[in-house]
Amino acid sequence: GHRCAGGVADGERHGGRGVDNGTFVTAGLVLRETETKESDKILTVLTPELGRISVIAKGARSRRSKYTAACQLLAYDEMTLRRKGEWYYLAEASTIELFDGVRQDIEKLALAAYFAELTEAVCQDAMAAADMLPLLLNALFALGMLEKPDRLVKAAFVWRLLAETGFAPLADGCAVCGRESPEAPMLDVMQGVLRCGACRTGGGLSLPLTEGAVQALRYILYCPPKKLYSFSLDESGLRMLDRAGEAFCAVQLERGFRTLDYYKAFLVEEDGE
C-alpha cells in the first residue's frame, strides 16, 4: 500500500529489523533501477543501516507485479529483503513516499535523478548512510513541496552532501590573508578554499562568489540538517554559488554526471544560458 510520509521525510524511523525465515525489513530509497533479463530489475537502494546495496527484484517489470511502484527510481519504500551471498533479494515492498510533486514535473524529476546519481557516487557501499538518507529525502521533499527555487535546493544539497562526505571547503575566511569577509571573494575549487580576489592561491580554477553567496555557503555547511533550505539568496549570488558547487563537485570527485548534463539541457532551452 502507499502511505504518505508526514512532513519532512525522515530516514531514522525505519531501521533494519529481523523477521523470521531469514528475511529482514528495512527502509530504502531507490537510487537507480537497471533492467535485466526477462522481467527482473536490479535496484541500487540507499538504506539507513546497510548504506548502499544492490537488490534483485524478481519479476518487477512484469505487468502483474505488485511492486511496480516500489521498484521505480526515487521510490522510498519499506522493503522485506532476503540475503544470499553478496546479493539481496526483494521479498516484499510497500511505498512510504513517491514524491509526486517531483514526479509530475519533468525538470524537477531530472534534477532529483542527479541528486540520486551524486549520492550514489559519494556513498560507498559499506559506508553508513545514516546522514545521507535523511539528507536526500529532505532534498526531494524540498523540491516537491517547498516553494523554493530549484537552483537553491540544488546548490544547498550539493554543497551539504559534499561536506557530509569529507569534501567541505574551508569557508571561514581568505586562505591567504585571513580576512573573515574576503574582498571580491573567489572560491579555489582545486584546493577548496576561499580567497580575496587580489590574493593568489595555487593558480588552479577559481570562481567568483558574492558576499551573500559566501554567507549562504557558510550557512549551508554549518546549519542544522532540518534547516538546510531556510535561507534566501538573490539570483546572481545563487547562480554563482550553484556554478561553484558544480565545479567543486566535478574537480573533487574527478567525474561528470550524465543526469546533470540531462538536467542542464532543460535550463538551456529555458534561458539560453
What are these regions (language model features)?
Residues G1-G18:
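N-terminal amphipathic/basic-hydrophobic helices that include classical n-h-c signal peptides
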Residues A5, G18-E273:
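Non-catalytic alpha-helical scaffolds and adjoining flexible linkers that form interface surfaces
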